């Protein structure tokens, strides 16, 4: 089974490579409403002072 994650434009998505079983979206802390990056990832990154990550593990949940 391969996860599908949305790309930055939500109408488009990609099939994740094996081993990348999370979808994520990344926000700048200065603007938490508009994601600046979306895709597949293997481990959810930690949030920092500048960026916030939201990760999930179902198809196109990002």
Curated annotation (Swiss-Prot):
Localisation: Secreted; Target cell membrane
InterPro entries per the UniProt record, alphabetical: Cytotoxin_Cobra, Snake_3FTx, Snake_toxin-like_sf, Snake_toxin_con_site, Toxin_cobra-type
Tissue distribution: Expressed by the venom gland.
Subunit annotation: Monomer in solution; Homodimer and oligomer in the presence of negatively charged lipids forming a pore with a size ranging between 20 and 30 Angstroms.
Signal sequence region: 1-2
Natural source organism: Naja sputatrix
A Gene Ontology BP annotation from the UniProt entry: killing of cells of another organism
The protein's name in its UniProt record: Cytotoxin 7
Gene3D superfamilies: CD59
Positions of disulphide bridges: 5-23, 16-40, 44-55, 56-61
Gene Ontology terms, MF aspect: toxin activity
């Amino acid at each position: 089974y391969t996860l599908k994650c949305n790309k930055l434009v939500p109408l488009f998505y990609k099939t994740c490579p094996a081993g990348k079983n999370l979808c994520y979206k990344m926000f700048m802390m200065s603007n938490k409403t508009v994601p600046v990056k979306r895709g597949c990832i293997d481990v959810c990154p930690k949030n920092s002072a500048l960026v916030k990550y939201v990760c999930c593990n179902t198809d196109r949940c990002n």
